[in-house]
C-alpha cells in the first residue's frame, strides 16, 4: 500500500470525513478533507484534528511535509 493510500485509510478510519483527497509522495503530502466536524472550528483546530492520527508517521520521519486544506461540507459546496 502506498503512503497516500495508507494516510487516506487512516484518516477515514479515525475521522468522519465526507471527502478525502491525498496526493503526493513520501516526503510531501497534500491532504484535502471535508467534514461537518469542521463546522465552527478555527483553522488551527482543524489542522490538529488531521495531524493527530498522522503523528506516528511524522515522528518516525515517514512524512516530511504536509499541506492540509479542510472544509466543512457547506464550505466545500460553496467552493
UniProtKB/Swiss-Prot annotation:
Disulfide links within the chain: none
Residues spanning the signal sequence: none
Checking InterPro entries in the record gives: BolA, BolA-like_sf, BolA/IbaG_stress_morph_reg
Protein name (record)? Uncharacterized protein bbp_348
In which domain of life is the source organism classified?
Bacteria
* UniProt record similarity statement: Belongs to the BolA/IbaG family.
Amino acid at each position: 500500500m502506498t503512503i497516500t493510500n495508507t494516510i487516506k485509510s487512516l484518516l477515514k478510519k479515525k475521522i468522519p470525513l465526507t471527502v478525502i483527497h491525498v496526493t503526493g509522495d513520501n516526503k510531501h503530502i497534500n491532504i484535502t478533507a471535508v467534514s461537518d466536524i469542521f463546522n465552527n472550528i478555527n483553522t488551527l483546530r482543524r489542522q490538529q484534528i488531521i495531524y493527530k492520527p498522522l503523528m506516528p508517521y511524522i515522528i518516525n520521519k515517514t512524512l516530511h511535509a504536509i499541506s492540509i486544506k479542510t472544509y466543512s461540507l457547506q464550505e466545500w459546496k460553496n467552493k
